[in-house]
Amino acid sequence: MPVAVIESLDHEGRGVAHVDGKVVFVEGALAGEQVEYTVYRQRPSYDLAEATRIIKASAQRVRPRCEHFGVCGGCSMQHLDSVAQAAAKQRVLEDALWHVGKVRPDIIYAAIHGPSWGYRYRARIGVRVVPKKGGVLIGFHERRSSYIADMRSCPILPPHVSGMLPALHELVGGLSIADRLPQIEIAIGDTAIVLVFRNLLPLTPADEARLAAFAGEHGVQVWLQPGAPATAHPLHPKGAAPLAYTLPEFDVAMAFQPTDFTQVNIDINRLLIRRSLQLLDPRPGERIADLFCGLGNFSLPIARCGATVVGVEGSESLVRRAAKNARRNGLHGRSEFHAANLFEATEDSLAALGRLDKLLIDPPREGAIAVVKALSTLQSPARIVYVSCNPATLARDAAVLVHEKGYVLRGAGIANMFPQTSHVESIALFERN
């Protein structure tokens, strides 16, 4: 069995070693460890491997809390201390900024920490009927596989939701369409839990009765989604209050649909908004754009600070809900929302937004390359706060801002939005030089 000394962790939380002149990425290994490993895939310049025995363990290694860790693909870093996880993610961010963007921040912000367990307020879990494995399987996908890990508990889900998993197995197993129900989406607000069942066939009256009884017994709302996300609708109870989460620091309540995009970690979301607005420093009289604004997660706190906010989002339905949230919170007088494809942004389309003193960008994993390239003398805000869920595209966009558009990267840091996983959420501040 080959042996390696692990030098560092990569962006997926794998140990990195060099053996006989070749890079080996070792799952389950930590920096500083000596491990035995098995190669499961070979490439000309690197191997992919899995640790089979830890010969010399890192002081940062901890016992995984979940019985499914190592099989389930939902988590990849439960074997690493939570503080060390954040430090590893900070290194991933700094490495990306330098190696991809050739930029370094003036300062590194302290990592934003929150609860390490029970934090996941949004999840999509798979459902499969596999008689050879005992019937219904419910869980995240297995590591490196399209198969479903059969989860009976999950410590990154809130305890009440994790505790429902055994009953959920029994419920699905009794439905007539169990083999035509590929996923269940979990969406949690401050006061309500919604389970959205993706049903590929209509339910029978008996199925609906079982689902309604489950909803009543467990204190959740059950929705059905027979088609695209827009088809999702409540089954039981009818007429329940909409899901919502609050941002108490800004006296804002955000209503949302269970299939809308919201951050999975409400505690980190609140802290990330606080950090973002500290850096953005919105003031009365300023006009600030929130690009990729979604439901108005950043827009409404900006407006609450007295600035006028212009929210832009690709989804027309989200734009309507953002405007509705602004009205509900009494902020419609300082906010406006527009639907536009920001992946096709141009100098003219940005200029059409009017004077912008500052900019907040919170794009999906693809980043905001069209937006940063479209910045010009027509639209050149003095300060940009960039919230990112992908260090590589943040670094790519930072290169354009710094090397082509005349901005300075004042600071950058991570928010541990997804503890126990390798996902890196980050924030960066750019100022016009």
UniProtKB/Swiss-Prot annotation:
Q: Which GO BP terms sit in this record? A: rRNA base methylation
Q: Residues that bind [4Fe-4S] cluster, according to the entry?
A: 66, 72, 75, 154
EC assignment: the record states 2.1.1.190
Q: Which Pfam families match?
A: TRAM, tRNA_U5-meth_tr
Catalytic residues, chain numbering: 389 (nucleophile)
SUPFAM superfamilies recorded: Nucleic acid-binding proteins (SSF50249), S-adenosyl-L-methionine-dependent methyltransferases (SSF53335)
Which residues are noted in the entry as S-adenosyl-L-methionine-binding?
263, 292, 297, 313, 341, 362
Q: Which reaction does it catalyse?
A: uridine(1939) in 23S rRNA + S-adenosyl-L-methionine = 5-methyluridine(1939) in 23S rRNA + S-adenosyl-L-homocysteine + H(+)
Q: Which PANTHER family match?
A: 23S RRNA (URACIL(1939)-C(5))-METHYLTRANSFERASE RLMD, RNA M5U METHYLTRANSFERASE
Family statement: Belongs to the class I-like SAM-binding methyltransferase superfamily. RNA M5U methyltransferase family. RlmD subfamily.
Cited function: Catalyzes the formation of 5-methyl-uridine at position 1939 (m5U1939) in 23S rRNA.
This protein's name: 23S rRNA (uracil(1939)-C(5))-methyltransferase RlmD
> Where is the organism placed in the taxonomic lineage, from the top?
Bacteria, Pseudomonadati, Pseudomonadota, Betaproteobacteria, Rhodocyclales
Gene responsible for this protein: rlmD
